[in-house]
């Protein structure tokens, strides 16, 4: 091999192994390639002065308590001696849960199970936090995961160049935007919850506290059973030994497919036409209620004809009742209905129990008016949720461009 060819191959190999992100801010496009090191070499740990036991978490207080739960704040304390203060932001890692948070204000550590980290020089804390969000440690089981986190290889540019700060600022601004939009979503959900409590009678009462003007003289609501609303169907599962029953375009709803949004459309499992023939079909706009298992009480409506598994009882409304009204009535009473299962290893409400549950019900026009009002709020909630999902997807895509993947470069 001649010298020129060898030189060309060397340059090609060097370019292939260079740690350079696919997207760089204009002022850094001609900057040096990034370096890489294990996270353990880039961080130091912070020891709290004390830990607040879970029994001493307050609902209100002067200082936030942070633990390894998914909530940003686990509780509050008034104990200043427990405060962790630092001039730099601090990363919180849930050793069992793998929850990842960044704290920029003083806080107290809750029960054991978190690691408090900060950048020790080559990489800033804010940059490291965003990098760890890009490629997080995923919980495998209930065990400690810090050793896995510590061994992660992190790619980083020179801190003094300002590129780390630029990336962190860009992604943090998206985090702030997502947080602001999430607060709007929470406000909509809170407003809807309060409105539902006003539009339906309290337990033991027959008239709601808030009524639309055209129904204020309509009289008391009647008490009816869920079975009065229409046909109640308990779901079933086609034989899993028959692969020809699965993988079609017909939704097969399980509790895992039901979110806190009103409608279910896409499901993890689908049925073929032949699989659909094996079960009792659930017509579109029916009301689906989980009656077995740990998620008992989840409720939804189906946008199109579907099937459900045996954990779900579905109500196909008759012409005298509104499916939307029943959905909101069951949502409001979900906890009360779930309590019918009592305490047992696998909570269950059978079809007879479920069908016999009594609910206050107005005439059909008022049912529809209530459903339309709350449906409008649900549309706002759905739109806001999609907006947040779009911002999260944008951030994820941006991180894929801003951070080089060490494994890909080294191949």
Name each model-derived stretch:
Residues 1-8, 39, 91, 97-161, ...:
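Basic, amphipathic alpha-helical recognition segments used for DNA target recognition
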Residues 1-37, 157-220, 356-411:
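Amphipathic alpha-helical coiled-coil/heptad-repeat segments
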Residues 272-278:
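Short alpha-helix capping/helix-loop boundary micro-motifs
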């Amino acid at each position: 091999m001649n010298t020129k060819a060898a030189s060309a191959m060397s340059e090609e190999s060097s370019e292939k192994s260079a740690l350079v992100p696919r997207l760089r801010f204009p002022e850094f496009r001609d900057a040096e390639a990034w370096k890489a090191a294990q996270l353990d070499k880039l961080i130091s740990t912070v020891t709290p002065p004390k830990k607040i036991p879970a029994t001493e978490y307050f609902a209100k207080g002067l200082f936030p308590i942070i633990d390894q739960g998914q909530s940003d704040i686990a509780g509050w304390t008034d104990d200043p001696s427990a405060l962790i203060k630092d001039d730099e932001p601090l990363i919180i890692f849930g050793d069992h849960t793998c929850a990842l948070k960044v704290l920029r204000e003083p806080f107290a550590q809750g029960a054991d199970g978190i690691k408090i980290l900060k950048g020790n020089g080559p990489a800033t804390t804010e940059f490291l936090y965003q990098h760890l969000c890009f490629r997080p440690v995923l919980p495998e089981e209930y065990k400690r995961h810090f050793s896995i986190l510590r061994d992660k290889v992190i790619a980083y540019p020179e801190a003094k160049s300002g590129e780390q700060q630029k990336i962190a600022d860009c992604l943090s601004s998206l985090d702030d935007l997502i947080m602001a939009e999430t607060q709007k979503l929470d406000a909509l959900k809170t407003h809807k919850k309060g409105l539902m409590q006003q539009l339906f009678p309290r337990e033991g009462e027959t008239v709601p506290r808030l009524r639309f003007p055209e129904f204020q003289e309509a009289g008391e609501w009647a008490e009816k059973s869920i079975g009065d609303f229409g046909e109640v169907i308990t779901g079933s599962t086609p034989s899993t030994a028959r692969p020809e029953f699965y993988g079609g375009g017909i939704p097969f709803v399980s509790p895992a497919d039901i979110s806190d949004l009103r409608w279910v459309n896409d499901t993890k499992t689908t049925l073929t036409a032949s699989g659909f023939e094996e079960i009792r079909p659930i017509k579109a706009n029916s009301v689906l209620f989980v009656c077995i298992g740990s998620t008992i009480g989840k409720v939804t409506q189906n946008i199109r004809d579907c099937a459900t598994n045996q954990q779900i009882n579905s109500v196909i409304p008759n012409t005298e009742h509104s499916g939307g009204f029943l959905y909101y009535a069951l949502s409001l009473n979900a906890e009360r209905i779930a309590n019918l299962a009592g305490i047992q290893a696998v909570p269950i409400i059978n079809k007879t129990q479920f069908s016999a549950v009594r609910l206050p019900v107005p005439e059909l026009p008022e049912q529809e008016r209530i459903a339309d009002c709350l449906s409008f709020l649900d549309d706002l909630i759905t739109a806001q949720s999609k907006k947040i999902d779009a911002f999260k997807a944008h951030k994820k895509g941006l991180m894929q461009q801003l951070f080089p993947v060490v494994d890909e470069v080294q191949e």
